[in-house]
Amino acid sequence: LHMIHLHWYQYPPMNPMMYPLLLIFMLFTGILCLAGNFVTIWVFMNTKSLRTPANLLVVNLAMSDFLMMFTMFPPMMVTCYYHTWTLGPTFCQVYAFLGNLCGCASIWTMVFITFDRYNVIVKGVAGEPLSTKKASLWILTIWVLSTTWCIAPFFGWNHYVPEGNLTGCGTDYLSEDILSRSYLYVYSTWVYFLPLAITIYCYVFIIKAVAAHEKGMRDQAKKMGIKSLRNEEAQKTSAECRLAKIAMTTVALWFIAWTPCLLINWVGMFARSYLSPVYTIWGYVFAKANAVYNPIVYAIS
């Protein structure tokens, strides 16, 4: 109780019907996520032709999504059953840390996948090809930096506290001290604004490169008096473009899922009167549900 902010005491208990609905939703998304990401990892690791440097990033994305739901899913089921957090203050902090860690690793893995597409499509032969060593270094960097940022609340830079609905835990966005808010400013920049800026930058040039390539192919085909050019280079470029579209779709779905979390943090800091327990719980539930999207999108590819 000492970890719960006074802001939440002004609200009555949530409608009891919310908990069964939330439990069913989490059961559905949890099973889909764990099964989908497990299959993704298994297929990529056991199919020799798929064990490429670029696909190491895909496997890392599936692993971070799997770990997120594996650690978030069971506690959420328990808290929904009991209508309150029953797992103690220590596990509350661990729960929030793991959620932040996996979310951060997921978005930065998507950023590196996007950057790899940018390198292949925009730079072409001038770009340095992704090697297994380089991909492994990227993955190590993702997890080290994500752990560094997410472990900070354990040392006093912000705190991990229960949400107002008492079914989950997260960062403290209601404290008004400069230290707590500075963490949210930096963390929002690190996990949302900077990745979004990099992603937009890469895709602007990817789209330009694809458009220029398609125009060049049409002009060349017109000069030759045929409908299209069906050579190996065109097929390869077309495959790369399809992969870029898949990556772009996945990134868009990720940002759609995690934007509510950003809004919750900033509304909590600057307009807390609009923040209710129901709003916070569904914001974070849909954020966790993004772990379901990625294996579906990559399975289609």
UniProtKB/Swiss-Prot annotation:
Example GO BP: phototransduction
Pfam families in the record: 7tm_1 (PF00001)
Membrane topology category: Multi-pass membrane protein
Annotated localization: Cell projection, Rhabdomere membrane
GO molecular function: G protein-coupled receptor activity; photoreceptor activity
InterPro entries attached to this UniProt entry: GPCR_opsins, GPCR_Rhodpsn, GPCR_Rhodpsn_7TM, Opsin, Opsin_lateye, Retinal_BS
GO cellular component, one term: plasma membrane
Extracellular compartment segments: 1-18, 79-92, 156-182, 268-278
Description of post-translational modifications: Contains one covalently linked retinal chromophore.
Chain ranges for the short sequence motif 'Ionic lock' involved in activated form stabilization as given in the UniProt record: 116-118
Similarity annotation: Belongs to the G-protein coupled receptor 1 family. Opsin subfamily.
Name of the protein described by the UniProt record: Rhodopsin
Gene name, Swiss-Prot/TrEMBL: RHO
